Amino acid sequence: MRAIAGLSMGGGHTITATINYPEVFGYIGVFSSGIFQPYEDLDGKMLALKASGVKKYWVACGEDDFVMESNKKLLVALDKSGMEYEYYENSGGHSWKNWRIYLSMFSPMLF
């Protein structure tokens, strides 16, 4: 299975790619991002993603990150679909300091 991860806008692209191509990615990392726009049939797409057999869906965001509200929308969508995921929240904001932490935590999960 392939892995995909992204930070900030790249995290948004990760969400879009995985809900539109649910059978492609088995390991998904979303760092400091969330749902910023309405997606057509988000509930159905999330259910299809869940059914595809995702091995790991990992989300992280800093408590002071300006995208926290969008991040919470992603968590609500994941909860609604019943998707299993791990969530990590730490201090700090939208910064490379946090993204280094997130990548160092997520990358070992791929092996």
Whereabouts are the PLM-identified features?
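Non-catalytic cap/lid and distal C-terminal segments of serine-dependent acyl enzymes
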Residues: 1-111
